[in-house]
Amino acid sequence: MQDADFLVIGAGIAGASAAWRLAAHGRVVLLEREPQPGWHSTGRSAALFSETYGPPQVRALSRASRAFLERPPDGFVEHPVLGERGTLVIGDPRDPGRLDALQAELGAGAAVERWSHDQALAAVPVLRPECTGEALHEPGARDIDVNALHQGFLRGLRGRDGELVCDA
């Protein structure tokens, strides 16, 4: 058996990121059941960075992650992790109060813009006009290169003398 200060089980993106962080504080062994890391959930990740998605706790984690994703450490990745995207939440014209409630829930700190019915239709011409209300646009939402991010954590773990054990 190998000696380790930390044993992390699961080498998907969550396990790899935890192992990378912990490796700054001691010897880490990262165990993966599959023949390669990221075989399951990481490979099917939605790959969207949004500060408006999910409950308040998830939104707080997203906001806290932005700086790292925008400026990962030198040598962590070969190209930017985030790419341009933006998101649009389309309101129901029969129930405009739901969009109002969402905007209020997100609060003044949310980086969203209220778009008119016409703006939403101009941006997404395939929308049916009769089913489209006003919208909330989040221009800061980004695509995440999940593979590059995952590989950066694994490379960083090895660079900190951590060990990945597959087929464990």
Roles of regions detected by a PLM:
Residues 46-123:
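Dinucleotide-binding Rossmann-like beta1-alpha1 core, especially the glycine-rich loop
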Residues 23-42:
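Glycine-rich FAD pyrophosphate-binding loop
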Residues 34-36, 120, 153:
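Short beta-to-alpha linker loops that shape the active-site pocket of alpha/beta-hydrolase fold enzymes
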